[in-house]
Amino acid sequence: MPSLLNEAHRLIEQRGVRFLLTGSSARKLRRGGVNLLGGRARTRHLHPLTSYELGARFDLARVLRAGLLPSIYFSDDPRADLEAYAGTYLREEVMAEGATRNIPAFGRFLRIAALCNATMVNFTNVANDSQVPRTTVYEYFGILKDTLVLHELPAWRRSVKRKPIVSSKYYFFDPGVVASLQGRQVALGTPEYGELFETWLHHELISHRDYQSGEPLTYWRSTSGFEVDFILGDHTGVEAKAKETVGPQDLRGLAALAEEKLLERHICVSLEPRRRIVRGIEIWPYRDFIEALWSGEFGG
């Protein structure tokens, strides 16, 4: 690979050749100090399938069960394929990268990390549960981020009335993969279902950011416990609620953030069948929201 990048560099400089180079991680290359085509290459991220790409073949129940990796989404046996994917990742991705030699320890960590999906991570607890030092846990989280298995969601810090928390949250890149690693079978109405629904919505939002809008994606949580799952740029707060009937308690975070008068819109994405507005907060059916998202209503 280093010699290939050097040759690409030469052809770019001497002949003006254009290349499309793909890969799952540049971790090993960066550690080796090789030519990364600085200033001559643009980085783009390719995510699993989106609702926009699936069109009429999009099925939320299947998404939360199988995830959005193309070969698994359309598989006749997604559960078996997801289990095999986790094994392939451990064997090929981690070992080939030379990221860690202790595969059993990393395997324990990976399943504990999956249980921390969509949360602020307590690294000490993860270290204790994984039976590895905390410094190793930081290293392992770095591996997951570098290999694009895990996304870090920074905190939005502009609120004034309520002091914001500054710690990041973490999301696995695919709801099917994280559910498989957790070893869970989810049912509508359970907290686990809500977490996967939120993970799917994060996937749609981060894909839209990388493919269209380019705007920052963050989340907000106050030290007093109010939280909004996602902030689009500095204009829209979005809360994910996997409920067929959204009540006032479900809107507490959005209502608290609305008091700051910093955002233009406050939206709850839900399983409700029709759009409605409650005290300035918009409640959207998830299908309507993602159609509006990809049509550019929220930027891009």
Tell where the protein language model's regions lie, with residue ranges.
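Conserved ATPase-coupling elements of RecA-like P-loop NTPase cores
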Residues: 1-8, 31-32
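Structural recognition of the conserved hydrophobic beta-strand(s) that form the central parallel beta-sheet
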Residues: 18-24
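Short, polar loop motifs at secondary-structure junctions
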Residues: 26-28, 268-275
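Short regulatory helix/loop adjacent to the ATP-binding pocket of P-loop NTPases
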Residues: 27-42, 58
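Conserved AAA+ ATPase "SRH/arginine-finger" region at the nucleotide-binding site
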Residues: 43-55, 76
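Accessory nucleic acid-recognition modules appended to NTPase machines
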Residues: 80-236
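Active-site ExK catalytic segment of metal-dependent nucleases
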Residues: 233-246
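Domain-level recognition of nuclease-like catalytic cores that cleave nucleotide substrates
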Residues: 273-300
